[in-house]
Design a protein with these regions (language model features):
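Rossmann-like AdoMet
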Residues: 1-34
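S-adenosylmethionine/decaboxylated-SAM
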Residues: 27-35, 39-213
Length: 213
């Protein structure tokens, strides 16, 4: 099944996040399947759909599944920026071979920018600001460096770009394990804001934390 076929199918169901997620999970033997729990990412996608975002920033794209989902529910003229590394080792970044596929995610008049760089570099932050024309963003998805220092730095650097009333979401907030310490950062900041959590397995893996700014 070609990406064009998937695009046409999802174009007809843009008002139905649950169906969009199902299509993405089943596409081409999981080629674009988000590294997510289906129920959790569906709940977040419903939030993003209601937000009707014009400016979206994703830190950590990997297989491209979540990036694809944001393009489906963002405005037809949205600016969407992905920041990720150039490597595809252990899902730390993605191969250059995926780049032309990801570029085809954009709908209608959407502008999709793939920034292949370290999100923690000041030059990357400045590039992201330029791509959004200096405007505040509506939705930020943080799913990059999962170390405590890494996720905290992404939060500190990019959360200030999000407008009041916007949404900031973190992936992997359910539990700390090994080098994955997102929950530690999440627990430190969540009570300072209105927030919600989507966790199918509260003591297990994954989990999504949502800040309502």
């Amino acid at each position: 099944v070609g990406l064009g076929s998937l695009n046409r199918r999802t174009e007809g169901i843009v008002d139905h996040p649950q169906e969009i997620v199902a299509q993405c999970f089943s596409y081409a033997d999981a080629f674009l399947q988000p590294v997510q729990v289906l129920e959790e990412i569906t709940s977040l996608l419903e939030d993003v759909k209601k937000l009707n975002p014009k400016r979206v920033l994703e830190i950590g794209t990997c297989k491209g599944g979540t990036l694809y989902l944001w393009t489906r529910v963002a405005r037809p003229d949205a600016t969407i920026v992905s920041v990720d590394l150039r490597s595809d080792k252990a899902c730390g970044g993605y191969s250059r071979l995926r780049t032309p596929i990801y570029r085809r995610f954009a709908r209608r008049q959407q502008r999709l920018h793939l920034v292949r760089a370290d999100s923690h570099q000041i030059d990357t932050l400045e590039q992201v600001k330029r791509l959004f024309g200096g405007s505040e963003i509506d939705f930020l998805f943080i799913d990059g460096d999962h170390s405590y220092a890494g996720v905290k730095r992404d939060w500190e650097m990019y959360s200030t770009l999000v407008r009041k009333g916007g949404i900031i979401a973190f992936h992997d907030v359910a539990s700390n394990y090994g080098e994955t310490q997102v929950k530690r950062c999440w627990d430190e900041i969540k009570d300072n804001f209105p927030h919600r959590e989507y966790m199918v397995h509260p003591e297990g893996l994954y989990g999504i934390g949502v800040i309502l700014k």
